[in-house]
A protein has these predicted regions:
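Aromatic- and acid-rich polysaccharide-binding/catalytic face
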Residues: 170, 176, 221-250
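Boundary/entry segment of secreted carbohydrate-active catalytic domains
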Residues: 32-76
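N-terminal secretory signal peptides and thylakoid transit peptides that target proteins
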Residues: 1-17
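Aromatic-lined carbohydrate-recognition surfaces of secreted/lumenal glycan-active proteins
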Residues: 128-138, 196-221, 269-276
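Substrate-binding cleft of secreted/luminal carbohydrate-active enzymes
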Residues: 270-347
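Aromatic-lined substrate-binding rim segments of carbohydrate-active enzymes
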Residues: 70-73, 85-133, 188-202
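C-terminal segment of N-terminal export signals and the immediately downstream linker at the start
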Residues: 23-35
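Active-site groove signature of glycoside hydrolases
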Residues: 158-185
Length: 348
């Protein structure tokens, strides 16, 4: 689908993309025509880790009841999403479940993990459960810190015992993200494999995912393929880094094409995309996250679709809300992205 056809298509759906213009660079970088993959999942959280970014939904989520968490899961299922990735089971040295590791978060819902997994059982959502943050989430040293590692592994065991009976407990996510520059660090591979070793013992049927950043810097050469072979993960969901302004939608197709070839050579982990459906209200990392216009999100989907098995988004929460929802979490503009995406998805 060329740029002109895409614009005509979106205008026909009434999504207000008059701002889209023909871009010769975009035309040159566009992947081969083909089906645009939908967004089949999203990251999920009880509190956003960067407080300034989550100012529009963190206060609402603190007050969510069990019923509201169920409503939110139902909403997500209604837009065709199948997977949710729970970013954190602990944050800022407080836990979202009952544990001796940390004191619990003071939330209106006594057991939010149970609430969302029970709802996910009902609505057919598959959850990846986050094995973090059991140290300082902003520190690069957390993955090598023996104290944090001990807490992290204790949490994996406790989470299995408490919630492993849920049909929606589909997999694990290791949230201390890697910076690919231009390869994974040995420390990150050791961290991943240590977590995965225990997870395989406790929950052998689950899938394991990571979502590294530095996608634009990745060098998918022989050494990179060997690293993919060495890591015990089932899925690598690469961040497209469009929302954080490190990459442009005209560039990302080439990044994912190279990574696809590396994954095909390795034949071990699946390649998924983690597209950022937000934009910053002001300075990157130091202002509120706002929903991106669907015209841009569509371009992100189009760019990665030929090269990945699935597309996940960062993230539904805060960036998308069903109009009139009793579980509203985010700014008013989030209903526009929800409606525009749902209109597109329903037309497929």
């Amino acid at each position: 689908m060329n740029d002109l056809n895409r614009r005509d298509f979106l205008v026909a759906l009434g999504m207000g993309v008059s701002a889209l213009t023909l871009d010769p660079v975009a035309a040159q970088a566009s992947p081969a025509p083909g089906r645009i993959k939908p967004i089949t999942g999203s990251w999920f959280e009880f509190q956003h880790h960067a407080t300034v970014e989550g100012v529009d939904w963190n206060p609402s989520c603190v007050r969510f009841s069990t019923r509201q968490w169920e409503t939110k899961i139902k909403e997500i299922a209604e837009v065709g999403m199948e997977y949710l990735v729970l970013m954190a089971t602990a944050l800022y040295y407080r836990a979202f479940y009952k544990t001796s590791i940390f004191a619990r978060w003071d939330l209106a819902c006594a057991d939010p993990i149970e609430a969302v997994l029970s709802a996910a059982d009902r609505y057919g959502i598959k959850f990846f459960i986050g094995g973090g943050f059991y140290g300082d989430w902003e520190s690069d040293n957390t993955i090598t810190d023996p104290v944090a590692a001990k807490k992290r592994l204790q949490a994996v065991e406790e989470l299995t015992n408490l919630y492993g009976h849920h049909a929606s407990f589909f997999g694990w996510y290791w949230p201390d993200e890697a910076f690919i520059n231009p390869h994974f660090s040995p420390e990150f591979i050791e961290y991943v494999n240590g977590c995965s070793r225990l997870a395989r013992q406790l929950t052998p049927k689950t899938q394991i995912m990571i979502a590294p950043y530095g996608t634009r810097k990745a060098l998918p050469d022989d050494a990179y393929v060997r690293q993919l072979d060495a890591m015990d993960v089932d899925i690598v969901a690469y961040q497209d880094e469009v929302g954080v302004r490190k990459s442009k939608v005209t560039e990302t197709a080439a990044f994912y094409e190279g990574l696809r070839k590396a994954h095909d050579r390795s034949q071990k982990a699946k390649i998924w995309a983690d597209i950022e459906i937000f934009e910053f209200q002001g300075q990157v990392y130091n202002s509120a996250l706002m929903p991106a216009p669907f015209s841009r999100v569509f371009q992100q989907m189009e760019a990665v679709s030929p090269w990945v098995d699935r597309i996940l988004a960062y993230q539904y929460q805060g960036m998308m809300n069903k109009p009139g929802s009793e579980a509203f979490a985010g700014c008013p503009a989030s209903t526009r992205l929800y409606t525009d995406y749902l209109n597109w998805h329903s037309a497929q």
